[in-house]
Amino acid sequence: MIALKATEMQHNNNALQQQQQLQHQLLQQHQQQHQQQLQQQLNSPDNNYIWATTHNANISRNNAMLQLQQQQLRAPWITDCNKQHHINNNNSMNVNYNQQLTQQPQQQQQQTQYMQHNYNNYTQQQQQQHLVPATTSQSNSHFYQCNQQQQQQQFLAPTTTTAAVVVAAAHQQHQTQQQHQSQQQQQHQRQDYASLQMGRQLGNFETGQSVLTLTTPTLTPTTTRNIEDTLGHLLSDTQTDRVAGCAGFAVPKVLPNAIDVLGMGIPTGVSSLPLQQTFDLSLGQGSESEDSNASYNDTQMNEEQDTTDTSSAHTDSTSYQAGHIMAGSVNGGGVNNFSNVLAAVSSSRGSASVGSSNANTSNTPARRGGGRRPNRSTNMTPEEEQKRAVRRERNKQAAARCRKRRVDQTNELTEEVEQLEKRGESMRKEIEVLTNSKNQLEYLLATHRATCQKIRSDMLSVVTCNGLIAPAGLLSAGSSGSGASSHHNHNSNDSSNGTITGMDATLNSTGRSNSPLDLKPAANIDSLLMHIKDEPLDGAIDSGSSLDQDGPPPSKRITLPPMSTMPHVHLSTILTPTGASSGSLQTPITSTAPGGFGSAFPVTSNGSSINNINSIGNNMNSPTLNAHNKVPKERPNTLAFQRPLGQMHLTMANNKAGGPTQIQGVPIQTPSTGTFNFDSLMDGGTGLTPVSGPLVPNSSSTNKHPLELPTPTAEPSKLVSL
């Protein structure tokens, strides 16, 4: 109340200042009029009135200064009267304030009229008094003096008029500054009045944001800040998401029409300030049942907030209307008469939750948060107190259960997180171990691949001859020879299928390894071969088989007729060695069974060589040696080629040393195994055979053991293409 009175007194002082400003404005208008008149008189050709007008202007300025001094002396007396008036009328403060607001314009008008009337009378009198000497001075007796005075006034007139203009301009600037200050003061007064009115309206409304003390005599910075915070929270609609979804409570929208409620206009002639706005604080599904956590109402505000329940302590489930607070109804007297206003608001509230049997309709004022709430309210029945105690105990238990449940859930989640972290760490370690093992295995595989390739190449070097395992040294010896020995690759003509088969003498030309097998032949191989039983040749055994199936298939082999069908071909003529000069046939052909090692044995004479070849060929087909042949077949290296029998003529030369051997008139000058290579026949290919010097047998090469024959690398050889 003291704050209200202080603001009203300030308002009265401001009104007095406004009156003074109006008086200053009137004086300014009069001064401007006089200045205009002076300028007109100075510009006129008649100079007789110069002295009178300047004198009148000076008199008018003096009168204005006197009036201002009188007003300044009168202002303190008016303020003292107003203070005494407000002190004597504390109970009817609002009425007097409103009456004074209505009476102030009337008083101002009366004062301004009175002052203006007096001022006009005074100025008229002064003008009359000063114009008389100006008129009487115009006589013939004082003509010379008048002329002198007129001349002096003419010289002094510009100076006096310029000084008057400068003074008037300075006075106008001072007046504009005063007007600007007065406008700022009026704005501050409006703001103070608006804040005061909002404080009246919000003094009975609970928002839980600030606390208005009951003993504050004036508007302190703390209270103004609290009012601003309250307005900010009321105008912002961000409270709906604050505790949404907590224990079934929903925060209501507080003051949706707060802008309409807070009327910012200053009432001018109103004797009462009715507040008839409706504040809806109803919850969405609020009820007053005893079995619901949403049974908080305004009576719960009077208890101490000693629980940490999820519900908001300053919200309730009641919907009420703010009562009509009449400004003249506060008649209790005294300074801190604030309980009457609260009682008026609480008495006009609506019933909480219509249709509920357990609704609390207490008229206790709800505090706005902060501080310790009273233990009991004034209008509380014993039943309501008991219900409140039961509800309070139940809320405490529910809050404790909620806290315990929240702690348990947090602990469970923490343990689960720790377990997952441990599991992830173990999985990372396992991944590292597996990665290391994978790298080691890859390294071992990379280092072992070269060894595997070498072993495979060594295994592929194993060859067979007529189904028998033959050493690589014998094959290499059979495909090449030195200059002092002749090597006859013994081929067989299979009469059952009509194909020429024999040992592969070109295996060494394919880039394979030439490391021989660890085969240790018997010491007396001649006596061992003599005991081998002769058996017929099995047509199913293919002498061209190998491990990797090299060469063309059997269907591409050259087919030659058997020697028995050829006319006039004698065995002795075929096996007769020829000289090197005639380019003789180096491949003997026989009609007997194929022999594996026939080409590896020395040739002493024609007859002995034939017997040796026949005996060896017959002995090589024994089942004793065939039983050791358990390896896969070798790739065929012969070409199955059908030729007409009529065109096949072997033209052999005489049994001379230099007679050439011809097939259909073409002399054969290169040694071969009796097998025509497919590539060499088609494209010329790579059918390269090592050729030595003159193939003339001597005694040094014929007496050697079969396994002691020279290898292809024994002597340098020549490569001749077909």
Swiss-Prot record:
Compositionally biased intervals (Polar residues): 283-300, 506-516
Region (Disordered): 173-193, 283-317, 350-407, 477-519, 683-722
An annotated Gene Ontology molecular function: DNA binding
SMART domains in the cross-refs: BRLZ
Stretch list, region Leucine-zipper: 413-420
CDD domains (alphabetical): bZIP_Fos
Stated family: Belongs to the bZIP family. Fos subfamily.
Assembly and binders: Homodimer. Heterodimer with Jra. The kay-Jra heterodimer binds more stably to the AP-1 site than either of the two proteins alone.
Function in brief: Developmentally regulated transcription factor AP-1 binds and recognizes the enhancer DNA sequence: 5'-TGA[CG]TCA-3'. May play a role in the function or determination of a particular subset of cells in the developing embryo. It is able to carry out its function either independently of or in conjunction with Jra.
Name of this chain's protein: Transcription factor kayak, isoforms D/sro
Organism field: Drosophila melanogaster (Fruit fly)
